[in-house]
Amino acid sequence: MSYTIFSKKKNNQLKEPMFFGQPVNIARYDQQKYKIFEQLIEKQLSFFWRPEEIDLSRDRIDFQNLPDNEKHIFISNLKYQTLLDSIQGRSPNIAFLPIISIPELETWIETWSFSETIHSRSYTHIIRNIVNCPSLVFDDIISNKNIYDRAQNISIYYDELINLTSYWHLLGEGIHLINGKKIHINLRFLKKRLYLCLISVNVLEAIRFYVSFACSFAFAERELMEGNAKIIRLIARDEALHLTGTQHILNLLSNIKNNENMEDVVLECKEEAINIFISAAQQEKKWASYLFKSGSMLGLNKDILCQYIEYITNIRMHAIGFKMPFKKQSNPIPWINDWLTSDNIQIAPQETEISSYLVGQIDSEVSDNEFKKFEL
């Protein structure tokens, strides 16, 4: 199927599937097949923020006074988060936009990816405010085996979908000889790669950030690195929205009532999808061991983090219809919810930067019915 950025063929976008239908031509929002994506877009736009709004001058002093094992925890997490959001700042656009068929999903993907670039900029803002030579931190990201191994598990699903989609657009379905290698292209196989890629992205948003989040908030609970925690809190708020987006996409694909023609694919890929979740949980436990190899920090250690990983993995898998792989348990670090739920804490504006504000949340549309109860 040849791809075009503007299809001249008139179609009814309400009857198009989310993926692998006719490419989007007119970006219209007066009619929507799935209104949830418009709601996500509006919410993300209301969240807009810039890392430069947060003062990190105190964090530099705090960081210099941290023991070496806590400096290792702090910097290692920033490196890993930089890698994750470097991937997420570009990959959803490259992988999903060429195969999306409805405008509201197309715009949500673009809005989502843009917000990830703000996260990447945030890590640079944090790092250059606490160390004298940021290049030493960034240059180590690719060469650090503990980070590199996890990156491979994330990028492989994106890369495979992107490559196969390119072949499909250029050559169509069939068996093709490319550089001496036979490539089998068919729509059903593409749908499988799409579903597994979406699962991998869901896992990234659902699990992979939360070890780093927990460590950042644990520092702030001790009134250390508080500027960093404010930025991470804004990032966590965004990531929760992105997680909601991927969960909705996956649940819509698996619901037979939506006519997405993916039910069989979902069933066939279920075992591999579950393995992606479990594998990610094990990798995050390994990462926790790496972080705390030289000692724990006050309020958090490897064992507690591993319990938390199992706890959130159960919740995330249940949210998309999978069975919980680990023993059911309560949240081992309940205080983290105060940081992950942005409305829980009231702060006087003159005391600190507010990290829970929303932009453009006033509804300016007023109907005649609003005035019926008024009497002159």
UniProtKB/Swiss-Prot annotation:
Its EC number is 1.17.4.1. The active site is at Y123. SUPFAM superfamilies: Ferritin-like. One of its GO terms (molecular function) is ribonucleoside-diphosphate reductase activity, thioredoxin disulfide as acceptor. Binds 2 iron ions per subunit. It catalyses: a 2'-deoxyribonucleoside 5'-diphosphate + [thioredoxin]-disulfide + H2O = a ribonucleoside 5'-diphosphate + [thioredoxin]-dithiol. Fe cation 2 binds at E116, E205, E239, H242. One of its GO terms (biological process) is deoxyribonucleotide biosynthetic process. It comes from the Bacteria. Fe cation 1 binds at D85, E116, H119. Its cofactor is Fe cation. Gene3D superfamilies: Ribonucleotide Reductase, subunit A. Tetramer of two alpha and two beta subunits. Belongs to the ribonucleoside diphosphate reductase small chain family. Provides the precursors necessary for DNA synthesis. Catalyzes the biosynthesis of deoxyribonucleotides from the corresponding ribonucleotides. PANTHER family: RIBONUCLEOSIDE-DIPHOSPHATE REDUCTASE SMALL CHAIN, RIBONUCLEOSIDE-DIPHOSPHATE REDUCTASE SUBUNIT M2. This is Ribonucleoside-diphosphate reductase subunit beta. The gene is nrdB.
